[in-house]
């Protein structure tokens, strides 16, 4: 086998490097292009460049592994950076600003405006600028850490080989000691409803609508459904979410928090039909869509007509054409790749992380798995406590939680105590005129140890990380209550809730 540097120099002389601009202040990524008869030697080959894949690739290179990352799309970053977490947060943030300016909020603060207009094209442009900068940033980090980026569809063609098929049909073979599958997930289709990303859209299409629909129906009131539904509701659409379950916010949310969350969203104008199932959708000649619904338990049918139907019933692992069957790697009943605690499949040098394995489909969970998986390859310890992985819904107000909910503790028969503190009693929330919501802490009755934290309110997505740290290190409610928190800050509500849990009473409520 040729050495890495020899292959690199040989190709450079032959002119097989293609400098591709990635929009980050003139920097360039340098993917490696070779002929199929010149395989690349690698220690670690990562398939997929989403949050799990790109982080794992960088960490592997930092640990001294010769690393290749294969990505089928033109840009790095996977679903999260391109059509998921990042663009949705841009629209969530900007639609919140528009909602404040367009409603009575600004006037109540003494900010008077004669006219507020929505420039949707400009809003989409700002979203795209953020995405371009961040995806380009990964390309720069790959270059900086000497990760080789191969653009193509990766397939495992042997236990020590991956073949990437490029858009032009050419192939690139990578001979590798270790393979890490980080191919993420895809939208779960709704039976009988065809997504065209025009008027019947997935989360991808909902991020790029050309105009604000008059009426939108969202199938699913989980995290993605309420986030994207709230974007278009704030921008002026009449939005109704149809949810099979009896609550909003998806799996894991505390029911008390969910009820309060639903109340706040409804006050903003978001409509919900809970315990209701969608039985079909028909596109009419005028372009509108008739959505057929009925009670989840069965009953009288009803039709809701809308301009845009958003399908948000979840995501499923993306494992198409990876070559798993040929290797004898079978998927579990939910389409996930079975792995052990070191993220190894049944073939020890083939690993899998992120959305293709068990656990919540969260970008930060995939990042953690990517780092510790690669550290394990290098002989390090592998540890992740999924109970300490936080979840966030980025609406306004935000919802965030980590650890156990009240419902889970009851189901597990664990005796617990509760501490609550409303943002209405928090001085910073008062000065911001943003007081909806509360902090709820669950502590073990016998030991005072923090078991769960549930936050509904401004800055919840930032505050929950203090709770995750407390859970990871086994802190008690008293530990947090005795830590001095700056005043006036929203995080004081977190301290006060822990005071209530540990001592039975907070100070300011």
Swiss-Prot record:
GO cellular component: acetyltransferase complex; acrosomal matrix; branched-chain alpha-ketoacid dehydrogenase complex; mitochondrial matrix; mitochondrion; motile cilium; nucleus; oxoadipate dehydrogenase complex
Membrane spanning residue stretches: none
Modified residues (N6-acetyllysine): 66, 104, 122, 132, 143, 346, 410, 417, 420, 505
Sites marked Important for interaction with PDHX and activity of multienzyme pyruvate dehydrogenase complex: 448, 473
A Pfam family matched in the record: Pyr_redox_2
Keyword annotations from UniProtKB, A to Z: Acetylation, Cell projection, Cilium, Cytoplasmic vesicle, Disease variant, Disulfide bond, FAD, Flagellum, Flavoprotein, Mitochondrion, NAD, Nucleus, Oxidoreductase, Phosphoprotein, Redox-active center, Transit peptide
Impact reported for residue 89 to E: Abolishes dihydrolipoyl dehydrogenase activity. Does not affect interaction with PDHX
Recorded consequence of changing residue 383 to L: Reduces dihydrolipoyl dehydrogenase activity
UniProt binding sites for FAD: 71-80, 89, 154, 183-185, 355, 361-364
Cofactor info, note text: Binds 1 FAD per subunit.
Residues forming the catalytic site: 487
Resulting phenotype, residue 448 to A: Reduces interaction with PDHX. Inhibits multienzyme pyruvate dehydrogenase complex activity. Does not affect dihydrolipoyl dehydrogenase activity
Effect listed in the UniProt record for changing residue 383 to A: Reduces dihydrolipoyl dehydrogenase activity
Recorded superkingdom: Eukaryota
Activity modulation notes: Disruption of native heterodimer state inhibits primary dihydrolipoamide dehydrogenase activity and induces serine protease activity.
Cystines in this chain: 80-85
Transit peptide: 1-35
Function, in words: Lipoamide dehydrogenase is a component of the glycine cleavage system as well as an E3 component of three alpha-ketoacid dehydrogenase complexes (pyruvate-, alpha-ketoglutarate-, and branched-chain amino acid-dehydrogenase complex). The 2-oxoglutarate dehydrogenase complex is mainly active in the mitochondrion. A fraction of the 2-oxoglutarate dehydrogenase complex also localizes in the nucleus and is required for lysine succinylation of histones: associates with KAT2A on chromatin and provides succinyl-CoA to histone succinyltransferase KAT2A.
Entry similarity comment: Belongs to the class-I pyridine nucleotide-disulfide oxidoreductase family.
Protein name: Dihydrolipoyl dehydrogenase, mitochondrial
Gene that specifies this protein: DLD
